Regions:
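Short, solvent-exposed loop/turn segments at the edges of secondary structure
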Residues: 68, 104, 146, 176-177, ...
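Histidine/acidic-residue-rich, glycine-tolerant segments that coordinate divalent metal ions
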Residues: 143-230
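N-terminal helical capping/dimerization or prosegment-like subdomains
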Residues: 2-99, 315-319, 332-334
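A common structural junction motif
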Residues: 91-92, 241-245, 338-346
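Active-site metal-coordination/substrate-binding segment of hydrolases
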Residues: 81-150
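An extended, acidic, His-containing surface patch that forms the Zn2+-binding/catalytic region
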Residues: 48-52, 57, 74, 80-82, ...
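Short glycine/proline-enriched loop/turn "hinge" motifs that connect secondary-structure elements
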Residues: 15, 101, 143-144, 201-207, ...
C-alpha cells in the first residue's frame, strides 16, 4: 500500500472527527447581512486558531475591522515556503430568511439520514472543514511537503469580499500568490447513464447591482390625478425587464462538451434554446446552467418606495441583480439598459460593479491533479472534468486577478445528490459522504502538487 492510500485510509478512520468539526463550525452563526456591523467571522477564526494550536499548527488572523477576521494557515512541515497550492474558502454565511420553515435548527448542526443540516453547512463550512482536516491529518502523520501549502478562509464572501479576499489582495497580495488555488464553485457530479462527470469551475460570470430610481410627482392619495404615480411606471419597468431578450452567446468552453450530455448537434446561438428545452427533461441542472451561461440576466430583487399609505409615491427604487458574460463590460450593460428603458421618462440608474467576469485556462496541471486526486478519493479509475463557468461569483476572482490559476472544486461524492444541498435555502445541508470525499481530495491534491516525499 502506498503512502497516499494510507493517508486516505486515515481519513476514513477520522469520519467522526470530521463530522464534529463541521458541526462546531455550523453552530457559530457567522451571518453576513451586508450591513455593518455584521459577519462575526472572528468567532469562527478564533475557534479554528485554538484548535490548530493544539495540533502544533500556527495561524494568523488579519482584519480590516474588528470582528471580521481572515484566517491564514501555512502548513508547517515544508522544505520550501514558496506557496504551490492555496486552499480557499470563506467563513461568513447568508442570513436565514424564515426560520419557521426550517425542519432543523439553522445553527444546530443536526444530523439526519447521513446529512448535516444548518446554514453554511454546504456554503462554505464543508469545504473549510475538508481543507482543515486534510492539513491536520497530514501534519499528525509527519508528512513533509517539498513546496508550500496555504489555507485562507476569508470574511465577507457573501457580500463581495471587501472585508475578505478583496481587502487581502489590496493589502497583502503576497499571501494570495500561489501557482494554483482551489476554491468553492465546482466539483458537482453530473450523472449521465452509467457515467459520472464533474463540473470544474474555471470561471465566473460578472455581477453588477443596478439601483433604478423611478420618478413621479407626489400628491394626496385621495386626489391621485394631481400627481404622477411612480408605481405605474414601476410596472412598466418590470414588464420591460421581464420581456428583455438578451443577446445569446455560446462561446464559453462549457458548450464544447455538450456531446457528454448526449447532444449531437453543434451548439450555436440558433439552436441553444431548443437544446435547453430538450435537456430540461433529462438533465434539468445542465439545462439551467446552459441557459445561464448563454446570456446576460437582469433580475429585480428589491423594491423600495413610498413614505405614507395616503400619499402618491414620488419616487421608487428598484434594485436588480445583473450577471454578465466575459465580453460584457460595464459599458455594454449601460448600453443595454439605455435601449431597454429608452421610452420611460424620469428614470435614472446607478451601477455598482461587484465582480468582473473571470476565468482560468482549462488545460493545466491543476486540472490533471484534481482529476487524479478525486478519482483516488472516490475509488474509481478516472473521472471526466467539464469546464464550467459559474453563474454566481466567489473569491476566486481575486486570486485570478493576482495571477493564480484558480479552480472551483469541492470534491462532492457521486452518491450525494446536489439538489439536497439547498445552498442559501431552507434546510441547507451537506452529505457526510461528501465531507469525507472532499477531505480525501484536498489531501491527495496537496500530496500530489506539493511533491510530498
Amino acid at each position: 500500500m502506498d503512502k497516499l492510500q494510507k493517508l486516505l485510509n486515515i481519513v476514513d478512520d477520522s469520519v467522526e472527527e470530521i463530522v464534529e468539526l463541521e458541526q462546531e463550525l455550523v453552530r457559530i452563526p457567522s451571518i453576513n447581512t451586508g450591513v455593518m456591523p455584521t459577519g462575526n467571522e472572528s468567532e469562527v477564526c478564533d475557534f479554528i486558531s485554538d484548535m490548530l494550536n493544539k495540533e502544533g499548527i500556527k495561524s494568523k488572523l488579519l482584519h480590516r475591522d474588528p470582528g471580521r477576521d481572515n484566517l491564514i494557515v501555512d502548513y508547517p512541515n515544508v522544505i520550501s515556503t514558496e506557496c504551490k497550492l492555496l486552499l480557499m474558502s470563506h467563513t461568513d454565511v447568508v442570513p436565514v430568511e424564515n426560520e419557521s420553515k426550517w425542519k432543523y435548527d439553522p445553527f444546530g448542526g443536526e444530523i439526519s439520514s447521513g446529512r448535516i443540516y444548518g446554514r453554511g453547512s454546504n456554503d462554505c463550512k464543508s469545504l473549510l472543514t475538508s481543507q482543515l482536516m486534510s492539513m491536520i491529518l497530514m501534519n499528525r502523520e509527519g508528512v513533509k511537503l517539498d513546496k508550500g501549502l496555504r489555507l485562507i478562509s476569508g470574511a465577507d464572501e457573501e457580500h463581495g469580499g471587501r472585508w475578505g479576499f478583496g481587502w487581502l489582495l489590496e493589502n497583502y497580495p503576497e499571501l494570495l500568490k500561489a501557482e494554483y488555488a482551489v476554491n468553492e464553485g465546482g466539483g458537482i457530479p453530473v450523472e449521465i447513464g452509467e457515467k459520472i462527470y464533474y463540473l470544474l469551475g474555471t470561471g465566473e460570470k460578472g455581477r453588477l447591482e443596478v439601483e433604478i430610481t423611478i420618478k413621479g410627482e407626489s400628491a394626496h392619495a385621495s386626489l391621485p390625478w394631481l400627481g404622477v404615480n411612480s408605481s405605474y411606471k414601476l410596472s412598466q419597468v418590470l414588464d420591460l425587464i421581464k420581456n428583455y431578450q438578451p443577446k445569446l452567446d455560446t462561446s464559453l468552453p462549457f458548450f464544447q462538451y455538450m456531446d457528454y450530455f448526449g447532444v449531437e448537434e453543434k451548439i450555436s446561438t440558433k439552436n441553444i434554446d431548443q437544446i435547453i428545452k430538450i435537456l430540461e427533461q433529462k438533465l434539468p441542472r445542465v439545462s439551467h446552467l446552459s441557459k445561464a451561461l448563454s446570456r446576460m440576466t437582469i433580475t429585480p430583487t428589491i423594491i423600495e418606495g413610498g413614505i405614507k399609505s395616503n400619499s402618491v409615491p414620488e419616487k421608487i427604487k428598484l434594485i436588480c441583480d445583473i450577471r454578465t458574460l466575459p465580453f460584457q463590460d460595464e459599458k455594454y450593460v449601460i448600453e443595454e439598459l439605455d435601449k431597454l428603458f429608452d421610452k420611460i421618462e424620469e428614470i435614472d440608474y446607478e451601477i455598482d460593479y461587484m465582480s468582473v467576469p473571470n476565468y482560468s485556462s482549462f488545460d493545466t496541471k491543476l486540472k490533471d491533479s484534481i482529476s487524479k486526486a478525486h478519482a483516488k478519493s472516490i475509488g474509481v479509475d478516472e473521472i471526466k472534468l467539464i469546464p464550467s463557468t459559474s453563474n454566481g461569483f466567489t473569491d476566486s476572482r481575486f486570486t485570478r486577478e493576482n495571477g493564480t490559476i484558480t479552480y472551483g472544486f469541492s470534491g462532492a461524492h457521486p452518491d450525494d445528490d446536489p439538489i439536497l444541498a439547498n445552498v442559501h435555502g431552507t434546510d441547507e445541508s451537506i452529505g457526510i459522504s461528501s465531507l469525507v470525499s472532499g477531505t480525501k481530495t484536498m489531501l491527495a491534491l496537496a500530496y500530489d502538487l506539493c511533491n510530498s516525499e
